[in-house]
Amino acid sequence: MQGSNTAGPAPTVLIAEDEFLLALEIEELLRGMGCRVVGPAAGVAELLVLIERTPCDLAFLDVHLRHDETVYAVVDRLQALKIPFVFMTAYGEEGIDPRYADARVICKPFSERQIESCLSALMPSKPWQGEDGVPRRH
């Protein structure tokens, strides 16, 4: 399976986040921008299963997950499948493993505009619109 960056009008976005309320907020933001959402999931094993079962276009990944897990095994799989990703962390870029120094990072707390900016940068060919089909204003 590979990232399907050109397939279909609604991109599919994987969410990795262990904070329940934040996961729901991210999911709501992405759906409001016209995305289909996979997850959210809070553990590495669950995320790896989701990646294999559901083709994704992009992933938003909390670095530190439940049970002191880090998301790096998931990142390695996404890279192998050529699926772009964004790290979400409260620790800034300093909290990212040096192997992923070139990755896109947004710091918590983040804004809707930051999420939208990541979507536009990583998937510029997708139509960023609301659930009602009306293009979003920037």
Predicted features and spans:
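Non-catalytic signal-transmission and effector/linker regions of two-component phosphorelay proteins
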Residues: M1-L14, A45, R104, S111-H138
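Conserved phosphotransfer cores of two-component systems
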Residues: E52-T54, R77-I83, E94
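Hydrophobic/aromatic residues positioned on beta-strands within the core alpha/beta folds
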Residues: M88-T89
